[in-house]
């Protein structure tokens, strides 16, 4: 194991074209112009871009870069890139120069026809554009290809529609900035110039041995196991969570941290998660668009470094049945450029009128658009996880904690909030331990949307998904709530009276969304139904929320999406679901036909030979015969279920693409997949391990 010491302060951000590098390398005027673009949205002229491009190129070459790429996030859910070298056409001498222009920096032209567009673009309409997002720093990535200058960009069509996640994210950030500033001005704040959503996504993942991974076609093709019986031990002892990190995993984490720190990702926390072989990495907060980029870098780095350590990183939400799946807690807050966190309640929240207005606006936003928030976490893999006593329920509710709930109860019942519950001190009963301050409220891990001191934690997001979508929705629905509140308060004759009445009104009208209890309980499901809260269990049930009149009006009002963009994204979501389930079904068919059935046939022959041999020796062969009969019966069930899955999968392929096909995959194909898995998993508990054609769950999650 390497004992080489790392000086984090020295290496952090060394491969990032950050503010320090720009100040050092750019002429003062160019630097000021770029900062105006970053901070105020001023347009960048080509002359300035040329200077920036030249210095960026020189800096990247010093880092060993030979190529650059416009690094963007199309609607595939994973980053895309095309690499171009810095070399220009050869000179008469035969030598080449290294060049990179301002035009090449600010705009690229990838073929848009091969990316999902949901009908926005025909196949022959190939032109698309990438545009430099100068608010997210460029960085040099080091990998097997060498060193590449990665330039974060947005991606749009020839006619201007967003074909990516970043464009609407930036639009939503503009929306909440504008409306939050309106709200701050009402409270006399004249100093804050910009309000930015801050995001800190906690990334969960599994690690398995690469050799064992390569023996599982389901993991290779789908990212999750489609067959597999539980080993004798799972997670029931709670001994993996926060347990001692194994040496192999620790070495992996060390390399991950080093690579992330070099590209400016503030990897902060790492630990074992609940399930065996499951782990978590969490960064420090960053501005939303940078946090989204950083999370993509985190996922890429986890996968790349795992391979270097002879492992595979699984980012699927549910790679193994029977143990916890993986999510990505999206910690969200809104902060000003001069350091004000608008979600900080202070020591006496009942006296903090601005905070109470912000809080009740957020309650209104979540209550009005719970379906949209749920849709933002919709993913085929997440269907296995949500509502399964390991992740938040599929019902959106807000946890506020005792202190804030008490303040709102006072407002609702009496019209005045006169006090806030205090935290006090925690008594341990041990004199040698320090006195600990006790928070005013506990935490609730079963809540999908929880207030945790000075931020909200949205816990529904899937582990492999970009955090762009939930933050687009959060930013936009809160911008709407702020805008509506400002429309009322800006017209008020008596601001203090009007804001008091509005806080009480919002608290009362949106009380149903607040729930501080056990989100895993069946009682909550019944209570939520009585409250009229939507319970959306599957991705296909969630997708329609994107294209309701309410959603279209919301997103068009704040310039985040057009109706056409929303319709295209809904279409892509349906296609994504259908394709994912189709691949899983075809993989199950392939594995059952080519691996399991041949193995079962061989094993029944072995059992039959054993029965005959024992009987021929004059001994009692009833036990052997009983095992043979059981295996034969389960093999028959497997063949019947396999034929049924083949039939229904072919039927699904013939359905019209879109909602009809996706719903058929959900209602008919997925249950047929479960029906095939059941007898195979039973057989795994009977068949000789030497005869089983692939590594078991025990091999995968306990031998890494």
Each model region followed by its residue ranges:
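Composition- and surface-driven signal marking solvent-exposed, interaction-prone regions
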Residues: 220, 295, 317-318, 344-348, ...
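Active-site proximal loops enriched in glycine and acidic residues that flank catalytic Cys/His/Asp
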Residues: 48, 72, 101, 283, ...
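Hydrophobic/aromatic-rich, well-ordered segments within soluble, folded domains that form packed cores
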Residues: 65, 69-71, 294-308, 334, ...
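Catalytic pocket of metal/acid-base enzymes, prominently hydrolases
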Residues: 2-31, 45, 127-132, 137-150, ...
